[in-house]
Regions:
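Bacterial Sec-dependent N-terminal signal peptides
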Residues: 1-27
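Carbohydrate-interacting regions of secretory-pathway proteins
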Residues: 23-217
Length: 217
């Protein structure tokens, strides 16, 4: 009996260790739900026209964020993020226009903030703009702070949902549009900050937002 116990002890320890490792990783990539009515209070709203009510521009219900296009500005998380994977869908509802996912937004909210803008402008989705003094290795004067997407535009027609994924990891940003890797910038001068969604005057919607916190390694 002792021999049998000794024989199975390493197997037991391996299973226990594997289980703990899986639980640790599962916790590290836990998803969160957004854009419900109760979620509206978890965001900071920044508008160029201070006379406009944020509730007239940004509307949340049943997991969908509606941006009406009034004035210009953005909403951002109250929480700061460093290494993460963001996935969301967006579509233009009346006519195509300009918008973006803002990542690593720095404090002192203004229109426009220090951040990296992942473009959603029609025909340019996947470009990355280094805004107001933030830099990356690829954001040079010669490209005028805009790192163009790698592949031809692959956005869907007006009214159809597009999928965008942004991965922030170890001072790099990767951007996928509808499953295609469109950008990869490195050497970020800001590797943490708030996450936001831009309003630039045209109605659009976002849905199915998830943000996974990634392990540091």
């Amino acid at each position: 009996m002792k021999a049998i116990n000794i024989h199975y002890l390493p197997v037991f320890m391996l299973l226990f260790s594997t289980s703990c490792f899986a639980q640790k990783n599962e916790k590290a990539v836990q998803q969160s739900s957004f854009f419900t009515k109760t979620d509206a209070e978890n965001w900071v709203y920044v508008l160029k026209d201070k006379t406009v009510a944020a509730s007239d521009v940004f509307k949340m219900d049943e997991g969908i964020l509606q941006i009406t296009g009034i004035s210009s500005g953005y909403l951002r998380t109250k929480k700061s993020y460093t290494d993460f994977e963001l996935v969301t869908e967006w579509r233009w509802t009346k006519t195509v226009g300009n918008s973006g996912v803002l990542v690593h937004i720095q404090p002192n909210d203004t229109v426009w903030p220090q951040c990296y803008q992942v473009q959603q402008k029609a025909s340019d989705a996947g470009d990355i703009i280094c805004m107001n003094g933030l830099w990356a290795k690829e954001c040079t004067d010669s490209v005028k702070f805009t790192v163009k997407k790698m592949q031809p535009s692959n956005e869907k027609p007006l009214g159809e949902w597009n999928l965008i994924k942004v991965i922030s990891k170890n001072k790099t940003l990767k951007v996928f549009v509808n499953g295609v890797l469109q950008n990869n910038i490195t050497g970020l001068t800001a590797s943490s900050g708030f996450i936001g969604f831009q309003n630039e005057g045209k109605p659009l919607e976002f849905r199915n937002l998830s943000i996974k916190i990634l392990n540091k390694n």
